[in-house]
Structures are given as structure tokens and as C-alpha cells.
A protein has these predicted regions:
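Q-loop/switch helix immediately C-terminal to the Walker
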Residues: 85-86, 92-109
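Helix-to-loop junction immediately C-terminal to a conserved catalytic motif
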Residues: 48
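Conserved structural motif at the start of ABC-family nucleotide-binding domains
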Residues: 2-4, 17-19
Length: 252
């Protein structure tokens, strides 16, 4: 469904991702680990097509369509959705207006909105607030998840859904996401993996030193990270090989 081929990305002339290869088949949810500042959010921005994230080389494929140079709105139309870690504040735009746009004007639109807000424990008055203005950490997460659920994308990217959230909201959001992701495809980004207490991921990857250093079973990789931190990933033969190949190519 989503395939990245040797993707290299720059921001303001600085290389932030290099030769990233990743493939997420239809119906699978993958998790991407990585230390702070490793480029996890940058990868999401590049996949979405934000212009400041310039693709230097490589390809992005979605459902066998080359979307490398496609505008953001066209990618969204194809079914790519995202829940940001730190969404922007938009004054004058009500959360409820955004949700109504996503849901549409069908005969069951009102009922669906009520069902979604009830599922996320969102009071009706919350919808009348300016988008993300003065929202707490838990409110931001629920607002982002509400928007994603309203859009019903075929492929969803979740940027640190477990950051800045208390235990109660984490459990609520986690269980809702796990149910929503059944039968869908997605990329879940996390630093410490708390969200994985509630969400099942088919495969895990580690982003380190601008590239994906290793991939494998989610439980195994998470266990290593929790025990040894990301120092464990430095021992990965795949990462060492890629670093060696990079040094050789730079010398040529």
C-alpha cells in the first residue's frame, strides 16, 4: 500500500533522511521507533508532501501510484490521513465545522458526529471551540483522533499519539485506535511505545542516523529498546552495513 524507495529528504539544505526504504502492505499497521530528533516526524511530513521537506532522491508509492511530486490535497484524496503530534492552532475555525466538513451532509451525518464524540468522551460544547486553541494534551489528542475518525482514511499516520497524554486518555485513545485500525493500514510513530499496550502492530522499524536501521517483530524490538535504549540499535548489523556503504560512497 505504501512503499518508500531509497528516499532522501532535505530541509533548508540539510539532509535529514537518507536512503529510507519502507513497505507497508495493505491491511498492516507498522510502528516506527526512534530517539528524539531522529527524523520520525520529518518522514511523515515528506510522505504527506509538505514543500519544505524536499525530496532529493527516491520514490514514494501509494497503492502503486507514484505520489513523490503529488500535491498534499491529492494525496489526501487518495486516502492518506494523519494525526499530528503538535497540530497548529487555527483561530476562527471551530472544531465542529471541521468535523462536519469531513463527515459531509448525508442523512446520517448528525448521528455519526454524535457517535464519534460520545466514543471519545467529547462534550458537545467542545465542538464550538476554536481548533486547538487552549486545548490540553488530552484534548489535543482526542481532537486529532476525532478528525481522523471522521475522515475514515484508508491509510493513517499517527505521530506520537502517546506523548503528553495521561494514563486515562492514553487507554481511551489507544483502544479506539486499535479498533479503528482493524482492516486498515497505518504507520504509528512512537518514542517509548506506551501506545502499544493497546494497539497491535504487525511489524516494527527503528529510524536511526537518518535511515531505517533495523526491522522486525514489534514485541522483540520494543523489548530491546525498553531494556537497553537505542544503544541496542547501534549494534544492528544492518545499520553498521549501511553506515559503511555510506562512507564508501562519500569517498568515491
Amino acid at each position: 500500500m505504501l512503499k518508500l524507495e531509497n528516499l532522501s529528504v532535505e530541509v533548508a539544505g540539510k539532509r535529514i533522511l537518507e536512503d529510507v526504504n519502507l513497505e507497508i502492505p495493505k491491511g498492516e499497521v507498522h510502528v516506527l521507533f526512534g530517539p528524539n530528533g531522529s527524523g520520525k516526524t520529518s518522514l511523515i511530513m515528506a510522505i504527506l508532501g509538505f514543500s519544505s521537506y524536499r525530496i532529493v532522491s527516491g520514490k514514494i508509492w501509494f497503492n502503486e501510484i507514484d505520489i513523490t511530486r503529488m500535491p498534499i490535497n491529492e494525496r489526501v484524496k487518495l486516502g492518506i490521513g494523519v494525526a499530528f503530534q503538535t497540530p497548529p492552532v487555527i483561530r476562527g475555525v471551530k472544531l465542529g465545522d471541521i468535523i462536519r466538513i469531513f463527515i459531509g451532509n448525508g442523512t446520517n451525518a448528525g448521528q455519526r458526529q454524535r457517535e464519534l464524540t460520545k466514543t471519545l468522551n467529547i462534550p458537545s460544547e467542545f465542538l464550538s471551540r476554536d481548533l486547538n486553541l487552549g486545548f490540553s494534551g488530552g484534548e489535543l489528542k482526542r481532537s486529532e483522533i476525532l478528525q481522523v475518525l471522521a475522515q475514515k482514511p484508508g491509510f493513517i499516520m499517527l505521530d506520537e499519539p502517546d506523548s503528553g497524554v495521561d494514563v486515562e486518555n492514553l487507554e481511551l485513545v489507544g483502544k479506539i485506535l486499535d479498533n479503528f485500525l482493524k482492516g486498515r493500514s497505518g504507520l504509528l510513530i512512537t518514542h517509548l511505545g506506551y501506545i502499544l499496550r493497546y494497539v497491535d502492530a504487525d511489524k516494527a522499524h527503528v529510524l536511526l542516523d537518518k535511515t531505517i536501521g533495523c526491522s522486525g517483530k514489534t514485541t522483540e524490538i520494543l523489548s530491546h529498546i525498553l531494556k537497553e535504549g537505542y544503544k541496542w540499535c547501534e549494534k544492528c548489523p544492518t545499520l553498521r552495513k549501511r553506515r559503511y556503504e555510506r562512507r564508501i560512497s562519500q569517498q568515491l
